[in-house]
């Protein structure tokens, strides 16, 4: 049966799980099970799929493609999501081999190297237009970022949890708030999208503190992530936190309190942010205390009762609103500027009068040049960190009356970004850290490949 929401945001997500690996963290809330990747539980859907494939990346990707195609979805534009503990702390040879196997599965042919696999994927039937990696803020330095660029990464999810050093110390997180700020800045300056994992309800916090920190994350320019995964704290079987709960040292928020808090957070999120999840996908049998059921309906009801709306990207996407039967109008170009990590972010979007979001572009005016681009593009270069047109995914070259894709909105957004970079900010070039499978699109618009980036001089 075709699940409409699977490709409704314009791409096909394919989750791939690494083999069980040791994690440098010792967080008291993190589940640890034998023969299961760190932070996951044995019966989670992604874990069960990975186990059936012996945690081999090639088998996992091939299986997911076959299942998604059998469900009637296009698989031309794929976003790979690498899951399973802290991948970047694993053996480096394993990392490169794992990513290569993902591309080989998309390509249907085994390449001689990762670079060859990426080149093949530029024109393959199943193109990787996005690649996401999860990591810790303290395992996100320049060396790790360069490795991610080698992989073709476009989005990084940081395990931030909550921006408070006292909480970090209490839960044995192993890093500081300053590490979050530094990692966020580096990721932005290299042109990557930055999402945070956000955990209200941790030991040492309170609903009031969680809300204040949630407000701060968007008011403090050191942070301002592009997206959030809201993961209310759960007491999971076998964790140190479960022992604290049994001893009375920790009590999770009542369900109503947590649902109200999530509604408060959603109400304050800026329109440039995408909230992709509001609860971790952990089977209820492994949850000793805390929320076990989806929050979306309860949160929506609270917001409606307050006459409030969540303005996040997911709630405003063309495809999601179309599925709900909402009428869409004619999109017009909008612009939102905000400071972040020492530079300037310009959020361009096509939206209608009801704020329905058809497409977006994130333009960064960086605070420093990128040496990896060399003399030709290194100085006075702006960064396009994301270009995305929403609506039900269409196959390459396909047209559809009910989709926002393939109407030229992406080209218009990019043309506007080029004009702004040149005329308003005096930049002479743009660089885009695009997915490998999107490179041909940018080549058609005059961009060339330089050190993993698609670059163009602005005449």
UniProtKB/Swiss-Prot annotation:
GO biological process: tRNA acetylation; tRNA wobble base 5-methoxycarbonylmethyl-2-thiouridinylation; tRNA wobble uridine modification
SMART domains assigned to the protein according to its UniProt record, in alphabetical order: Elp3
A Pfam family reported for this protein in Swiss-Prot or TrEMBL: Radical_SAM
UniProt-recorded Gene Ontology molecular function terms: 4 iron, 4 sulfur cluster binding; iron-sulfur cluster binding; metal ion binding; S-adenosyl-L-methionine binding; tRNA binding; tRNA uridine(34) acetyltransferase activity
EC number, UniProt record: 2.3.1.311
Every Radical SAM core domain range: 6-271
Annotated region (N-acetyltransferase), positions in chain: 308-459
Keywords per UniProt: 4Fe-4S, Acyltransferase, Iron, Iron-sulfur, Metal-binding, RNA-binding, S-adenosyl-L-methionine, Transferase, tRNA processing, tRNA-binding, Zinc
Cofactor note: Binds 1 [4Fe-4S] cluster. The cluster is coordinated with 3 cysteines and an exchangeable S-adenosyl-L-methionine.
Catalytic activity: uridine(34) in tRNA + acetyl-CoA + S-adenosyl-L-methionine + H2O = 5-(carboxymethyl)uridine(34) in tRNA + 5'-deoxyadenosine + L-methionine + CoA + 2 H(+)
Binding site for Zn(2+): 310, 312, 315
Region (Radical S-adenosyl-L-methionine (rSAM)): 1-278
Function: tRNA uridine(34) acetyltransferase, which mediates formation of carboxymethyluridine in the wobble base at position 34 in tRNAs. The proposed mechanism is the following: (i) recruits S-adenosyl-L-methionine and cleaves it to generate a 5'-deoxyadenosine radical (5'-dA) in the radical S-adenosyl-L-methionine (rSAM) region, (ii) hydrolyzes acetyl-CoA in the N-acetyltransferase domain and (iii) an acetyl radical is formed by the products of the two domains and (iv) is transferred onto the C5 position of uridine(34) in the bound tRNA molecule.
Complex and partners: Homodimer.
NCBIfam families (alphabetical): ELP3
Protein name in UniProt: tRNA uridine(34) acetyltransferase
Organism: Dehalococcoides mccartyi (strain CBDB1)
């Amino acid at each position: 049966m075709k699940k409409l929401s699977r490709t409704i945001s314009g791409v096909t997500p394919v989750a791939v799980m690494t083999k069980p690996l040791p994690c440098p963290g010792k967080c008291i809330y993190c589940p640890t099970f034998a023969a299961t990747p760190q932070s996951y539980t044995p019966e989670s859907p992604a874990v069960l799929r990975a186990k059936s494939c012996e945690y081999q990346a090639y088998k996992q990707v091939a299986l997911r493609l076959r299942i998604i195609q059998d469900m009637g979805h296009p698989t031309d534009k794929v976003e790979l999501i690498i899951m399973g503990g802290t991948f970047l702390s694993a053996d480096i040879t394993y990392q490169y081999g794992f990513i290569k196997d993902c591309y080989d599965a998309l390509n249907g042919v085994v390449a001689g190297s990762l670079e060859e696999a990426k080149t093949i994927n530029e024109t393959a039937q199943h193109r990787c237009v996005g690649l996401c990696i999860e990591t810790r803020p303290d395992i996100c330095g320049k060396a790790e970022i360069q490795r991610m660029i080698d992989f073709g990464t476009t989005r990084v999810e940081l395990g931030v949890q909550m921006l408070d050093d006292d909480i970090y110390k209490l839960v044995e997180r192993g890093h500081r708030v300053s590490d979050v700020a530094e990692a966020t800045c580096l990721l932005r300056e290299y042109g990557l999208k930055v999402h945070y994992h956000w955990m209200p309800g941790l030991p040492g916090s309170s609903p009031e503190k969680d809300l204040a920190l949630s407000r701060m994350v968007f008011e403090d320019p050191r942070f301002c992530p592009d997206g959030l995964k809201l993961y209310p704290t759960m007491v999971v079987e076998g964790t140190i936190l479960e022992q604290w709960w049994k001893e009375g040292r920790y009590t999770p928020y009542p369900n109503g309190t947590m649902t109200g808090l999530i509604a408060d957070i959603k109400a304050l999120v800026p329109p440039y942010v995408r909230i992709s999840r509001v609860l971790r996908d952990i089977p209820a049998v492994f949850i000793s205390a805390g929320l076990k059921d989806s929050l979306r309906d309860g949160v929506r009801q609270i917001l409606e009762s307050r006459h409030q709306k969540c303005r996040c990207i997911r709630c405003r996407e063309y495809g999601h609103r179309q599925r709900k039967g909402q009428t869409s109008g004619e999109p017009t170009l909008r612009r939102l500027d905000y400071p972040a990590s020492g530079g300037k972010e310009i959020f361009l979007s096509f939206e209608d009068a009801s704020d329905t979001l058809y497409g977006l572009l994130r333009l960064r005016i960086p605070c420093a040049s990128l040496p990896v681009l060399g003399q030709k593009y290194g100085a006075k270069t702006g960064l396009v960190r994301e270009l995305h047109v929403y609506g039900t995914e269409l196959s390459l070259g396909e047209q559809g009356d009910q989709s926002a894709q393939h109407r030229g909105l992406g080209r218009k957004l990019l043309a506007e970004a080029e004009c702004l970079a040149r005329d308003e900010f005096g930049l002479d070039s743009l660089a885009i850290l695009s997915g490998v499978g999107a490179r041909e699109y940018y080549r058609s618009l005059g961009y060339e490949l330089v050190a993993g980036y698609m670059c163009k001089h602005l005449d």
